[in-house]
């Protein structure tokens, strides 16, 4: 299994003591604190409050929460029925409805248990072992698959740049957080960026091009890009510059015009790489709000309105196969979670003292009180605006001659 020694660890599961801890992402980047998850209720709260987030990560936390909850129940007498266990699992599934990974993992657990036990059977050691083995495999498979996604994305980037005859420095734009903090390790979209920088940074690249810079979007209103992606990029010393979500068009145009951004090289944006919370059968993709507009920006610069190979941008979705939902035909059928209004009208963070120390955390209002607010957590990018879907499979999914993805093949 691939190592996570060089990357952050958002999920800690102790196989010997059967304990689960998660890195509280609401406290990052100023405070690193691990939160104990002892029950399914703890997991529901952590997922709902977004103390853990990212489709693969919440699925893993959800599964491990069922493990620790079941283990504790057995130690306390073990009088819970399979039916009661399933009720708790169904409740946990409602914590984040848009991300398909959580639902898939919890439904897999129910199917495996139902294959051998009835609803009225007591949850015993055999039931526990089914849940335990599945959850450990889910974690280990996700980690291995993330490294495959990174390698496959790197290969696609190299092939694309060679095909375009591109030479020199290039940049990548991403949104939200899709790295070690959103998965078991390495990441999906950020995993591709990690793998690409490892092989294509200027000092290492054997090609005629190199990855010079990454531009993570702030990702309002929860600021996962500002808080989490910058935390990971800084941790691994990958050169980056944070931008607001509404700066991308200007950024791309400026770099494509061979102009510098601050002291950064005028390296054109060649790829926008995003993760996914759900990819449906036709390739429509639900991801963090703001993703759709990034695809329209890429589409504009790829149009005939602008010329020159430096202006061509590939829009890539990176996700494990577990994120692909073949039971849903189009993005119109995806349930989009809506978050509380106060997440948009307030900001939370610690006081930064003049001496550099960290003070108390406060919530500060930034909008007129009592106003109407619409705060969807996700949007849906139409498959027509997506160039490639990269999974752990060696085949990178691109559209056929009819402009359609064939994800079921």
Swiss-Prot record:
Principal location listed in the UniProt entry: cytoplasm
Active site per database record: 277 (proton donor)
Localisation per UniProt entry: Cytoplasm; Nucleus
Keyword field contains Cytoplasm: yes
Site (Transition state stabilizer): 176
UniProt KW keywords: Amino-acid biosynthesis, Cytoplasm, Isomerase, Methionine biosynthesis, Nucleus
Pfam families reported in the protein's UniProt record: IF-2B
Superkingdom in the source lineage: Eukaryota
Keyword Zinc: no
Summary of the function given for this chain in its UniProt record: Catalyzes the interconversion of methylthioribose-1-phosphate (MTR-1-P) into methylthioribulose-1-phosphate (MTRu-1-P).
Protein name (database record): Methylthioribose-1-phosphate isomerase
Organism, as annotated: Scheffersomyces stipitis (strain ATCC 58785 / CBS 6054 / NBRC 10063 / NRRL Y-11545)
